[in-house]
UniProtKB/Swiss-Prot annotation:
Transmembrane intervals: none
CDD domains: hydrophobin_I
Alphabetic keyword roster: Cell wall, Disulfide bond, Secreted, Signal
GO molecular function annotation: structural constituent of cell wall
Signal peptide: 1-18
Function, in words: Aerial growth, conidiation, and dispersal of filamentous fungi in the environment rely upon a capability of their secreting small amphipathic proteins called hydrophobins (HPBs) with low sequence identity. Class I can self-assemble into an outermost layer of rodlet bundles on aerial cell surfaces, conferring cellular hydrophobicity that supports fungal growth, development and dispersal; whereas Class II form highly ordered films at water-air interfaces through intermolecular interactions but contribute nothing to the rodlet structure.
Quaternary assembly: Self-assembles to form functional amyloid fibrils called rodlets. Self-assembly into fibrillar rodlets occurs spontaneously at hydrophobic:hydrophilic interfaces and the rodlets further associate laterally to form amphipathic monolayers.
Entry's Gene Ontology cellular component terms: extracellular region; fungal-type cell wall
Induction conditions: Expression is not regulated by ammonium and glucose concentrations. The introns present in the gene are required for the proper heterologous expression in the ectomycorrhizal basidiomycete Hebeloma cylindrosporum.
Protein name: Class I hydrophobin 1
Recorded family membership: Belongs to the fungal hydrophobin family.
UniProt keyword annotation of Signal present: yes
Length: 140
């Protein structure tokens, strides 16, 4: 019983000692920061987590399996293909030829690639030429 009386007395003392910002400013003190008692809609929204970029992830589209990956301007035959298709690519850009998307990484036959696995920025002519390719390792 004594414990309950002490708790009630402490709660009453805490409630009495709370002063308003108007009282603080009247005494020449700065106002206290506002207390947020309820969450804002932004606080209560479900937070999404960004996907990882490692381990076979590709942010620009599906992972591609290309038979040939070469640098434009390196006399590798890719330049002739780009010219025939009427595509203008800056010198030094990685270009993949004869590419097909890899649908399911790590499961079944969809993850098999006998060429080079790449992540490309631009897919032209239905996989015949992929521009802006970067080799990736599916085993990472």
């Amino acid at each position: 019983m004594k414990f309950a009386a002490v708790v009630v007395l402490a709660a009453a003392a805490a409630a009495v000692s709370a002063e308003t910002n108007a009282q603080r400013m009247a005494r020449g003190l700065p106002p206290k920061a506002p207390i947020r008692r309820h969450g804002t809609p932004a606080d209560t929204e479900k937070r999404s987590h960004p996907s990882s970029t490692g381990g076979g992830q590709c942010n620009t589209g599906p992972i591609q399996c290309c038979n040939t990956v070469a640098t434009s301007g390196s006399q590798s035959g890719v330049d002739e293909l780009l010219t025939l298709l009427g595509l203008s690519v800056p010198v030094g850009t990685q270009v993949g030829a004869s590419c097909s998307p890899i649908s399911a990484v790590g499961t079944g036959s969809g993850a098999q690639c006998s060429g080079q696995t790449v992540c490309c920025e631009q897919n032209e002519w239905n996989g015949l030429v992929n521009i802006g390719c970067m080799p990736i390792n599916l085993n990472a």
